[in-house]
C-alpha cells in the first residue's frame, strides 16, 4: 500500500479556481450568456465558487445550477438497489446559452458523458464546456476538459481525494495509494 501525497491546500484550490475563472472569461469574451452547472456532489460548490470569482472579476452574476447524473450513469446495473436520485436544479434557461459543466475530478470521462446526456434532456445549449479541478488522465471516452485546475498523472490504482469546505469541512486535494512523490 502506498502513501498519501498532498496535491493542493485551500490556497492552491483558490488559485486554481481564480485562474479557471479568468480563462472562462477570456475564452468566452466575458461572462454574458454563461451558466455554470455543477455535477453532484463536489462540482456544485466548485461551480458556486467559480461564479463568485467571475462576479469579482467581471462584476456579472453568473447563474449556477446543479446536475444529478445518477440515472444517466452507465455503471448502474439492473441488480443494484434503487439509486438515490436528488434531482437536477437549473433555474436558468439553458437554450442558446454557454453551459459550463463543473466537476472535481476528470478520470475516465464517463461522468462527463453522463452529464452531457442529462444536460441535453433539459434543453439545447449553444455550447457546452467542461471545467475540472483535477485531470488525472486514463480516459476511456474521447472527452477533454476546456479548463483544468491541475493535471495530475496517476496510476489507475491511485485515488484522487478532493475535500471541500462545504461538504467535508476542509479544502484539500490528496493522492492516495501513491508510490511516488508528486
UniProtKB/Swiss-Prot annotation:
E.C. number: 2.4.2.9
Listed GO MF terms: RNA binding; uracil phosphoribosyltransferase activity
Catalysis: reaction(s): UMP + diphosphate = 5-phospho-alpha-D-ribose 1-diphosphate + uracil
Pfam families cross-referenced by the UniProt entry: Pribosyltran
Keywords in alphabetical order: Glycosyltransferase, RNA-binding, Transcription, Transcription regulation, Transcription termination, Transferase
Disulphide connectivity of cysteines: none
InterPro entries, per the entry: PRibTrfase_dom, PRTase-like, PyrR, PyrR_bifunctional
Motif stretch (PRPP-binding): 99-111
Gene3D superfamilies linked: 3.40.50.2020
GO biological process: DNA-templated transcription termination
Superkingdom of the organism of origin: Bacteria
Subunit structure: Homodimer and homohexamer; in equilibrium.
Task of the protein: Regulates transcriptional attenuation of the pyrimidine nucleotide (pyr) operon by binding in a uridine-dependent manner to specific sites on pyr mRNA. This disrupts an antiterminator hairpin in the RNA and favors formation of a downstream transcription terminator, leading to a reduced expression of downstream genes.
PANTHER family: BIFUNCTIONAL PROTEIN PYRR
NCBIfam families linked to this entry: PRK05205.1-3, PRK05205.1-4, PRK05205.1-5
Family: Belongs to the purine/pyrimidine phosphoribosyltransferase family. PyrR subfamily.
Listed name of the protein: Bifunctional protein PyrR
Gene name of the encoded protein: pyrR
Amino acid at each position: 500500500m502506498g502513501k498519501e501525497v498532498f496535491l493542493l491546500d485551500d490556497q492552491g484550490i483558490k488559485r486554481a479556481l481564480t485562474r479557471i475563472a479568468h480563462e472562462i472569461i477570456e475564452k468566452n469574451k466575458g461572462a454574458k450568456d454563461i451558466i455554470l452547472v455543477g455535477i453532484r456532489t463536489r462540482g456544485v460548490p466548485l461551480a458556486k465558487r467559480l461564479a463568485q470569482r467571475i462576479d469579482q472579476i467581471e462584476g456579472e452574476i453568473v447563474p449556477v445550477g446543479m446536475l444529478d447524473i445518477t440515472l444517466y450513469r452507465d455503471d448502474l446495473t439492473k441488480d443494484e438497489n434503487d439509486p438515490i436520485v436528488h434531482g437536477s436544479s437549473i433555474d436558468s434557461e439553458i437554450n442558446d446559452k454557454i453551459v459550463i459543466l463543473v466537476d472535481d475530478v476528470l478520470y475516465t470521462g464517463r461522468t462527463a458523458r453522463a452529464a452531457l446526456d442529462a444536460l441535453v434532456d433539459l434543453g439545447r445549449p449553444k455550447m457546452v464546456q467542461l471545467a475540472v479541478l483535477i485531470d488525472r488522465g486514463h480516459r476511456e471516452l474521447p472527452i477533454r476538459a476546456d479548463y483544468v485546475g491541475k493535471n495530475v498523472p496517476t496510476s489507475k490504482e491511485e485515488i484522487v481525494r478532493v475535500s471541500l469546505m462545504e461538504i467535508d469541512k476542509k479544502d484539500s486535494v490528496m493522492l492516495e495509494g501513491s508510490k511516488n512523490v508528486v
